[in-house]
């Protein structure tokens, strides 16, 4: 059975203007789309932090680059993400999806150079037993820095490459990768295809924005689709909404 890794951006499932506020309509629509997918495919879901994780991360000065050894602060960020994860799990369970949590803080770590180590034995066994693992952006122990943030995008790349995903979907509030005129680029097979629109470099992309995302997705062995909420049903149906990123 084929494997799909699907990321739900934090801005899709939360109200990013209000701390720790779920976007009930957005989450319901996302869960409605995931349910039929889980009936016919093996699925791993990843969700972003939205107004849960980002609020606490900013308060405690923790980012993907800046770490902390303050256990109380690290727990505050992680606990907020668990609350959002519970909301996502509940929405999926209400639709008959056998969803289980996988918390990155307990599952992985970063090396001193920032490379992510994410053992996948537990996730793979969940899939084999018919469960839908649900991961999330989180704090993660980082050699030499205490704990830093691991983004949902980083998790998607590790999961897709480590588990051999057949398709990857990233649903956010933008309809795809946009060109300089604001139009969706249908397909990217090399970074040069989008370099002008993305500024040609991700050197200033400290939060892991679109340029960094495109570079990472080009390295995958599976096609990755970047789309907005309106494209989620099409992706689930096997179509190619938004931008497809396919490294050659």
From Swiss-Prot:
One GO process term, biological-process aspect: terpenoid biosynthetic process
GO cellular component, as recorded: cytosol
EC number, as in UniProt: 2.7.4.26
Role: Catalyzes the phosphorylation of isopentenyl phosphate (IP) to isopentenyl diphosphate (IPP). Functions in an alternate mevalonate (MVA) pathway leading to IPP, a key precursor for the biosynthesis of isoprenoid compounds such as archaeal membrane lipids.
Keywords, ordered alphabetically: ATP-binding, Isoprene biosynthesis, Kinase, Lipid biosynthesis, Lipid metabolism, Nucleotide-binding, Transferase
SUBUNIT field: Homodimer.
Protein name: Isopentenyl phosphate kinase
Catalysed reaction, written as an equation: isopentenyl phosphate + ATP = isopentenyl diphosphate + ADP
Binding residue positions for substrate: 49, 54, 152
Site (described: Transition state stabilizer): 16
Classification via CDD domains: AAK_FomA-like
Species: Haloferax volcanii (strain ATCC 29605 / DSM 3757 / JCM 8879 / NBRC 14742 / NCIMB 2012 / VKM B-1768 / DS2)
InterPro entries named among the record's database cross-references: AceGlu_kinase-like_sf, Asp/Glu/Uridylate_kinase, Fosfomycin_R_FomA-type
